[in-house]
From Swiss-Prot:
It holds the Pfam family Ribosomal_L2_C. It comes from Myxococcus xanthus (strain DK1622). PANTHER family: LARGE RIBOSOMAL SUBUNIT PROTEIN UL2M (PTHR13691:SF5), RIBOSOMAL PROTEIN L2 (PTHR13691). Gene3D superfamilies: 2.30.30.30, Nucleic acid-binding proteins, Ribosomal protein L2, domain 3. Part of the 50S ribosomal subunit. Forms a bridge to the 30S subunit in the 70S ribosome. Residues 27-38 have a biased composition (Basic and acidic residues). Residues 27-59, 225-281 are annotated as: Disordered. This is Large ribosomal subunit protein uL2. One of its GO terms (cellular component) is large ribosomal subunit.
Length: 281
């Protein structure tokens, strides 16, 4: 899939880029695999904002993705379409199974219409096939990885991301995450071979504020530009500094430069931390 640029007919158009959607083969989703998507605008049941910068955007229907594929072991599935999914950065592939059922999966790099994919221990090491980690050779590029057997894939699902199977020791496999972290995962957990498709997503430039609003992203206002009643950094005459020894959140918690990982319970599964300067996944 390539990147489309526009003639500079306006300041926004000058730098705006979009995907050319060359890999997309079907315009409308499979209706039986969609559900209504009720959105909250970042509010909880009391109407209070619990997630900032969220709301508005184009109306969407949720595409039901099969992140498990365990009940289709050994059943061949033919790829009949590659579709755009507004709810995620990756594209999705529509599968027609030999038993007549239809399902969506994430579309990896190299998967095209007409290909056949399998799931199960005996599946080949080919993009789109889903296998337990114990049946995948060390060094294989993978995505869509489970963290608990049977729960379904939870990590390495964004466009262009991939992990790598680094080693197998006893009950655990070591998987290198996109962040550089090497993590232990039970060898019974499943993963899909290959890299998640739509790899050009990270170089797309939104170009204008209005396009962010189409995507359901509301503006992010600096605390320094607020009043003291709204943010600890607010107030002052002119362009004064934020005035705190360390930058803080709107609720007074220290922010910026601090580790965001607080799940000590799973620290024992981290073999090595993320590389310096890497973006969190």
């Amino acid at each position: 899939m390539g990147i489309k640029k526009y003639k500079p007919t306006s300041a926004a158009r000058r730098l705006m880029t979009v995907s050319d959607f060359a890999d997309i083969t079907k315009d409308s989703p499979e209706k039986s695999l969609t559900e209504p998507l009720k959105r909250s605008g970042g509010r909880n049941v009391h109407g209070h904002i619990t997630r900032r910068h969220q709301g508005g955007g184009h109306k969407r229907r949720y595409r039901v993705i099969d992140f498990k594929r365990r009940d289709k072991d050994g059943v061949p599935a033919k790829v009949v379409a590659v579709e755009y999914d507004p709810n995620r950065t990756a594209n999705i592939a529509l599968l027609h199974y030999a038993d007549g059922e239809k399902r969506y999966i994430l579309a990896p790099v190299g998967l095209s219409v007409g290909d056949t994919v399998f799931a199960g221990e005996g599946a080949d090491i080919r993009p789109g096939n889903s296998l337990p980690l114990q049946n995948i050779p060390v060094g294989t590029v993978i995505h869509n990885v489970e963290l608990k057997p049977g729960r379904g894939a939870q990590v390495i699902r964004s466009a262009g991301t991939s992990g790598q199977l680094m080693a197998k020791e006893d009950r655990y496999a070591q998987v290198r995450m996109p962040s550089g972290t090497v993590r232990k995962v039970l060898i019974e957990c499943r993963a899909t071979v290959g890299q998640v498709g739509n790899i050009e997503h990270e170089i797309i430039r939104i170009g204008k504020a209005g396009k962010s609003r189409w995507l359901g992203i509301r503006p992010t206002v600096r605390g320094l530009a607020m009043n003291p009643v709204d943010h600890p950094h607010g107030g002052g005459e002119g362009k004064s500094g934020q005035g705190n020894p360390h930058p803080v959140s709107p609720w007074g918690k220290k922010t910026k430069g601090l580790t965001t990982r607080t799940n000590k319970r799973t620290d024992k599964f981290i073999v090595s931390g993320r590389r310096q300067g890497a973006r969190s996944q």
